[in-house]
Design a protein with these regions (language model features):
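Bergerat-fold GHKL/Histidine-kinase-like ATPase
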Residues: 1-222
């Protein structure tokens, strides 16, 4: 049976091995320590054989060879709605996440443009769902729109709101790389160059999945 450590002295001994400082009495959070790893084995298989991505694009994905970069990417991919998102507290009882990887912070200034967009979409939809008197308006992506999701099973025939945007590579911003969004999200085997990507998230601001869903997206967005 695996049980958590609860002895502060024992925990401190482990933290000292890795020169990691413990949280102060007023701090809460999660620290991920990955010791004694085989880097090559851990990063193996990020891009499987016959994934449909060109060798040139794979070569641009430097995160495939660097664990710190890969963790930064993974955090943004799954927690983008809350990473340094100070606007989220205006529309829900959620706190923004202050994330550091090897001591380096992830902020809105250095997030990858794709996940900065994901964050703005989430905040826009959250604002619409809360019926905010002053709905959130993205400065970075002003073309984001919100639509209601119809449902005959709920009062008001509405299940909430979804935020969406049609965007070009140039509109993603100067920091946008030549790496395809499908590559970042590991959506291999897409049928066209502009299949709509649907993001599913849960209340605390954690993303559950990204999927290519052409029929649902086109049915919702007229």
């Amino acid at each position: 049976e695996i049980l958590p450590l609860t002895s502060e002295a024992e925990i401190q001994t482990i933290l000292d091995i890795f020169s990691v400082k413990k949280f102060s009495p007023t701090q809460t959070g999660t620290a991920i320590i990955i010791p004694y790893i085989n880097k090559a084995r851990l990063l193996h298989g990020i891009f499987p054989d016959n994934c449909g991505i060109t060798a040139e694009e794979i070569a641009m994905c430097t995160f495939k060879d660097d664990i710190a970069q890969y963790i930064e990417l993974a955090v943004q991919k799954w927690y983008a709605p809350r990473v340094y998102n100070k606007a989220v507290k205006e529309y829900a009882a959620q706190k923004w996440l202050a994330v550091r990887v090897n001591g380096n912070p992830i902020t809105d200034a250095n997030m990858r443009p794709l996940f900065r967009l994901v964050q703005e979409l989430y905040t826009s939809a959250l604002s619409a769902n809360q019926g905010a008197t002053q709905p959130y308006k993205s400065k970075a992506f002003p073309f984001i729109k919100c639509v209601s999701i119809p449902s005959q099973k709920l009062t008001g025939n509405k299940a909430g709101h979804a935020a969406y945007i049609r965007i070009t590579k140039d509109e993603m911003g100067a920091g946008s790389s030549s790496i395809n969004p499908y590559t970042y999200l590991r959506l291999f085997g897409k049928t066209s160059l502009n299949d709509p990507i649907v993001m599913f998230a849960r209340t605390p601001g954690m993303i559950l999945d990204y999927k290519i869903d052409d029929k649902w997206a086109k049915g919702l967005i007229k």
